[in-house]
Curated annotation (Swiss-Prot):
This is ADP,ATP carrier protein 1, chloroplastic. Keywords: Acetylation, ATP-binding, Chloroplast, Membrane, Nucleotide-binding, Plastid, Transit peptide, Transmembrane, Transmembrane helix, Transport. The gene is AATP1. The modification N-acetylalanine is found at A80. It comes from Arabidopsis thaliana (Mouse-ear cress). Its main location: plastid. GO terms for cellular component: chloroplast envelope; chloroplast membrane; mitochondrion; plastid.
């Protein structure tokens, strides 16, 4: 009689135990027996040795299977060997040999560190560049001749959003025809080339390539209320830099880096290390903030007739190009030396879809819709507060040097605050789980946003108190708005971004790739552009940004409420997908090992590899 049991060990009763021990070492795994140059003389894990039981809990009568006294007295050796299905592990290297554990450093396996350290360095380089680009783009477009802060809402709505949609469509097409490696290099290399060309070619030639005369004629014809749209034409190369800097944040950070991180990490590793990725990233914020501050002071100390922006841009763009090349090198190293984790093979393979089919599929998915709600809600909420704050900042620091220096300090403070939040985030994930972590960011943004709007609305009564602190109401609003942005962005980097990226991991590859492209490249600018559209509508309706402040506060409350509802819905779907994935993996591990239970021969010992056709004289089954 022969049966098959779904288990992880091979239970065999050798016919000739003494002879078999010299030929077949059960303690050796299949891999060792096939490939080892010299078989090691290791004893297997024996349940009995020369008739004496090693494990007192082992009983000869199990679940109705009767074994005679003669059979019990027969001397035999029963050894259990791990089949090592799937993972290649060897169970039981004998009494004197312990199971070899993976080497660890500070309690973390070396194989895991080979992923985490390069990913942390990549995140450092990416956010170092992003901080420099983010601080520089505002100064370029706001302080340029013939431009002002009014250009920003128009840029986000009518330039940045169409560019983001166009990139998403192109990225979706490329993802169907290129490998992951080729797609990564195809996307990031044009960014590196452009930023180098801007610092060394486009900016020095800006006086020749900007249509100043045409812009002046249009401004005279259309009137000053169209100064924002006309400024886009007037300083088109600066606006292109602004858009490319915005796309660096949404494309390189969200799509390329997090997509790569999701590809090579498991959910358990993500829960433990995703919040810590930001530690290196926020050290980058601190250093890049100091870099911007240094070049701001350098421009201030240059002699007359020297274009400070030209000098500083060449230096900063050189740093950006160097960091970009370092990102490519780290990506190559990880792909070369770090193995990919095994994923569940039972997931449905999605067919290749066109652009419209992809969009329809993503819109029809409640999971993707909730993710999109999170991203759009954050973009609108932070934009409603941030643009108002930047208008106050422009009024307080009209000089480019002062504006840039303040932004450098702001980035440094953001890095310090986020670094602290990163240290606390792992505790939040371990103690309270994904759902609570996802709800902290909207709560922080709501509370700090209310404080900022309240100071603007009721700044008059607070003027005497603010004067005692040596500040004007305008400067106080600038500082409170800065604190609001610092707390909101630190919560975003330490909790919101890891939560969002962890939500992609249980998805199948097709939904993961195209969903990230649609959400991160389109929904992120859509949130910013949506906030800009709301502000433009309010300004046109109520005459000024100050008059529309109470209504902006009410809109902020509604959006954050929808954000919290989407986070709650996504929490349930995420936990359900995780449970399904774990169940599939367990089933794969169980089904990959089939263990034959062999019969006994006349000597009372089992025979290994007996076929069903064996004669009954040679095989006497036990009594059931």
């Amino acid at each position: 009689m022969e049966a098959v049991i779904q288990t992880r060990g091979l239970l065999s009763l050798p016919t000739k135990p003494i002879g078999v021990r010299s030929q077949l070492q059960p303690s050796h795994g299949l891999k060792q027996r096939l490939f080892a140059a010299k078989p090691r003389n290791l004893h297997g894990l024996s349940l009995s040795f020369n008739g004496h039981k090693k494990f007192q809990t082992f009983e000869p009568t199990l679940h109705g299977i009767s074994i005679s006294h003669k059979e019990r007295s027969t001397e035999f050796i029963c050894k259990a060997e791990a089949a090592a299905a799937g993972d290649g592990a060897v169970f039981g290297e004998g009494d004197s040999a312990a199971v070899v554990a993976s080497p660890k450093i500070f309690g973390v396996e070396v194989a895991t560190l080979k992923k985490i350290i390069p990913l942390g360095l990549m995140f450092f380089c990416i956010l170092f560049n992003y901080t420099i680009l983010r601080d520089t783009k505002d100064v370029l477009v706001v302080t340029a001749k013939g431009s002002s802060a009014e250009i920003i809402p128009f840029l986000k709505t009518w330039v940045n959003l169409p560019m983001a949609i166009g990139f998403m469509l192109l990225y979706t097409k490329l993802s169907n025809v290129l490998s992951k490696k080729a797609l990564f290099y195809t996307v990031i290399v044009p960014f590196i080339i452009y930023f180098g060309a801007f610092g060394f070619v486009m900016y020095p030639l800006s006086n020749y390539i900007h249509p100043e005369a045409l812009a002046d004629k249009l401004l005279t014809t259309l009137g000053p209320r169209f100064m924002g749209p006309i400024a886009i034409l007037r300083i088109w190369s600066f606006c292109l830099f602004y858009v490319m800097a915005e796309l660096w944040g949404s494309v390189v950070v969200s799509v390329l880096f997090w997509g790569f991180a999701n590809q090579i990490t498991t959910v358990d590793e993500a829960k433990k290390f995703y919040p810590l990725f930001g530690l290196g990233a926020n050290v980058a914020l601190i250093f890049s903030g100091r870099t911007v501050k240094y070049f701001s002071n350098l421009r201030k100390n240059l002699g007359p007739g020297v274009d400070g922006w030209a000098v500083s841009l060449k230096a900063m763009m050189s740093i950006v190009v160097g960091m970009g090349l370092a990102i490519c090198l780290l990506y190559w190293w990880v792909n070369r030396y770090v193995p990919l984790p095994t994923r569940s093979k039972n997931k449905k393979e999605k067919p290749k879809m066109g652009t419209m089919e992809s969009l329809k599929f993503l819109v029809s998915s409640p999971y993707i819709r909730d993710l999109a709600t999170l991203v759009v809600a954050y973009g609108i909420s932070i934009n409603l507060v941030e643009v108002t704050w930047k208008s106050k900042l422009k009024a307080q620091f009209p000089s480019p040097n002062e504006y840039s220096a303040f932004m450098g300090d702001f980035s440094t403070c953001t890095g310090v605050a986020t670094f602290t939040m990163m240290l606390l985030s792992q505790y939040v994930f371990n103690k309270y789980g994904w759902g609570v972590a996802a709800k902290i960011t909207p709560t922080v943004l709501l509370l700090t946003g209310v404080a900022f709007f309240s100071l603007i609305l009721f700044g008059g009564p607070f003027a005497p108190l603010v004067a005692k602190l040596g500040m004007t109401p305008l400067l106080a609003a600038v500082y409170v708005g800065a604190l609001q942005n610092i707390f909101s962005k630190s919560a975003k980097y330490s909790l919101f971004d890891p939560c969002k990226e962890m939500a992609y991991i249980p998805l199948d590859e097709d939904t993961k790739v195209k969903g990230k492209a649609a959400i991160d490249v389109v929904c992120n600018p859509l949130g910013k552009s949506g906030g800009a559209l709301i502000q433009q509508f309010m300004i046109l309706s109520f005459g000024s940004l100050a008059n529309s402040t109470p209504y902006l506060g009410m809109i902020l409350l509604v959006i954050v409420t929808a954000w919290l509802a989407a986070a709650k819905s996504l929490e349930g779907q995420f936990n359900s997908l995780r449970s399904e994935e774990e169940l599939e993996k367990e089933m794969e591990r169980a089904s990959s090992v089939k263990i034959p239970v062999v019969s006994q021969d006349e000597s009372g010992n089992g025979s290994l590899g007996e076929s069903p056709s064996s004669s009954p004289e040679k095989s006497a089954p036990t009594n059931l």
